[in-house]
Amino acid sequence: MNTKAGSRLEKVLKAGEFAVTVEVGPPRGPNAGAIIDKARLLSGVADGYNVTDNQTAVVRMSSIAASKILLDEGLEPVMQMVCRDRNRIAMQSDLLGASAFGIRNVLCLSGDHQKASASGKLKGHPGAKNVYDIDSIQLVSMVAGMRDRAVQEGGDPLTEPTPFWIGAAWTPLAPPTDFRVFRLAKKVQAGADFIQTQAIFDLRAFAHAMQQAVDLGITEKTFILGGVIVPKSAAMLRYMQRNVPGVVVPDALIDRMSQAKDPLQEGVAITLELIAGLRAIPGVKGLHLQAIEAEHLLPEILQAAGLLPRPMGI
């Protein structure tokens, strides 16, 4: 098997297996034990473990440090990098450091606006200056250049290439929806090897978006992993429906959660239905599963979905 980075995630996808990634959020402090506990809880349930980069613009342990802790625990991180907080010089420096640590998967993102950090009880940093020296498409291109040609974004050579399996995000149901597939195509053209979608709750709408991607030949050039967030309450679904761009939550799903005697178990049931639906959509090659502050549910869900054990010998 010819590989670009040699990561487990790359090998699983190229072997034709249905890949699984899950999310591990770093703590809002320096306690490595918080990451180690999650690593031990989730060991063996996925092919890659997304490590967020100051998600929702809330200050957390760096994605590089948390990714290294996962590596030390025997898990394969998918290190997220956002354009919000660094210019291209700092990004490339961090990418070199990540490569030196042995991190082999990088997910290139724009990053949540800093105003999102002031929510609930958190004051956040809504007045922080965003950077956006480059956008997420340019970030994909820059990482691809460092890997494929061993060059910096400015054209200067690197002493060695950085072997990364490069990921990007797709929000297929954000308006204008017909435009989104073309933005996806630009990311793939820039060098995105795999794609993780925003959370999907409307399978019919997502199937239409996937058909557009199939028709444009995108699914022949990259691997698309459908995103699923485990809903824990009707309030959580209602919040995402109203406040998370590109997340379409049918009213019927909110009503179902509202009427459930045990909302958490109903959320697990909904998650299993969504996973089964995603697997039936042509072009979907994997699952990106999130259980926000409920990671203990992931092994149970993946077992019930028939996605455990993960492929061996890869």
Report the location of each language-model feature.
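Catalytic beta/alpha-barrel core
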Residues: 49-59, 81-82, 108-109, 194-202, ...
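Short, well-ordered coil/turn segments that N-cap beta-strands
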Residues: 15-20, 45-48, 73-77, 102-104, ...
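Active-site pocket-lining/capping segments in soluble small-molecule metabolic enzymes
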Residues: 130-159, 169, 173-174, 216-276, ...
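Active-site-adjacent beta->alpha loops and helix N-cap segments on the catalytic face
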Residues: 2-3, 7-10, 31-33, 57-69, ...
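Glycine-rich anion/phosphate-binding loops
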Residues: 83-101
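Conserved N-terminal beta1-alpha1 strand-loop-helix module at the mouth
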Residues: 1-48
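Active-site mouth loops of central-metabolism enzymes
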Residues: 19-34, 55, 77-89, 164-179, ...
